[in-house]
Amino acid sequence: MCENIRNYNENELFHNFAYSICIGSAFDTQEVKSDANRSANAYIQFGNISIEAYEEIRNKVDSWLKKEYKSKSGKSLQVMKCIDFINSGEVEKVFSKYDPCKNKENWLDAEEYDKRCR
C-alpha cells in the first residue's frame, strides 16, 4: 500500500476518491477502470466518511461526465472533466455535508482524529 495515503486528511482522501471514480468512469479501457476502482477502494478503506457520501459522489460524477468537453481539434477531454469536477465545489459540498471531523466524540481514537482532521 502506498505510504502517502496514511498522511492524507479526511478531505484529501475524499477528493482523491472522487477523482479516482471520475477517471474510472470516464474511460472504457478495462485497465484504467480497474486501476481507478482499486485506488478508490483504497481511499474508502482509509477514510471515515459515511458510505452515503461515496454514493452521492458517484451520482454526481455520472452527471458531470455527461458534459461535453472538446479540445480545439474536437477530441474529448475526459481528464479535464475530472479535474474540473474535483475543483468545482461539488465534492467539497458533499464532504461538508458528511464531514466526519465535525464531531470528535464519534471517533474511537483521538490521535487518529487529530491526524485525519487537521
Regions found by a protein language model. Give the residues of each.
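Compact alpha-helical subdomains of small soluble proteins
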Residues: 36-118
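N-terminal secretory signal peptides
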Residues: 1-42
